[in-house]
Amino acid sequence: MAELKENTVQHTLCMPLCGRMIAARKCPDLFPDRDAERIVRELGEDISGKAMYRLQYMWMNCLIRQYNLAWEITEYLKRHPKATVVELGAGLSCLRRQMSNETNSRYCLDMENVIALREKHIPLGEHEQNIVCDLNDFSWFDKISFDPAKGIVFTAGGLFYYFETE
C-alpha cells in the first residue's frame, strides 16, 4: 500500500523523486542517484511502465530543477566553501547525497509529515539537520546556525506554488 495519499500536497513529493529515478535509469552516468528508486519503492508507489511514463515529461522538468539547484549550490560553494545550505520545502530531496557534500552545514525545512518521511527514508549527513516548521512563520530562521562571514545559500524548489499572494 502506498505511503502517500493520491491527489494530496504530500503526494507531489513524488514528482521530483520519480524524475530523478527515471533519469538515473536512462542516464546513470549523467544523473547518478542512488536514492530515488529505493525511496519510491519504500513509499509503495506504482512504478509500472504505464504509471511511470505517462507523466515523464513533467517529472523530467522536476529533475532538471533539482540538478539546477545542485549546480547553483555548487557554484555558490566555490565562492563560499564554508557556507551553510538551507533547503526550504526540502521534500524528499537528496541534494546533499547527489552532490557528495558532507562538509557544509545543511538544514532541510518542511512540514511535520514531510520531515517524518525524510527521517524514515533519507539518512542524515554528519552536518545535516531536519527542521519541522511552517515556512510562513519565520521563527524557523532562529533554528539555523550560520556565520554571515562564511555565507548562506537558500533553495526553494517547487515551493512557491503553495504560497498564497497577499
Please report, for each region that a protein language model flagged, where it lies by residue.
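Rossmann-like AdoMet
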Residues: 1-86, 90-133, 148
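A short, conserved alpha-helix within the catalytic core of class I
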Residues: 130, 138-141, 162-166
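Short amphipathic alpha-helix with an adjacent loop that forms part of the alpha/beta core around
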Residues: 139-149
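A short SAM/SAH-binding and catalytic strip from SAM-dependent methyltransferases
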Residues: 150-166
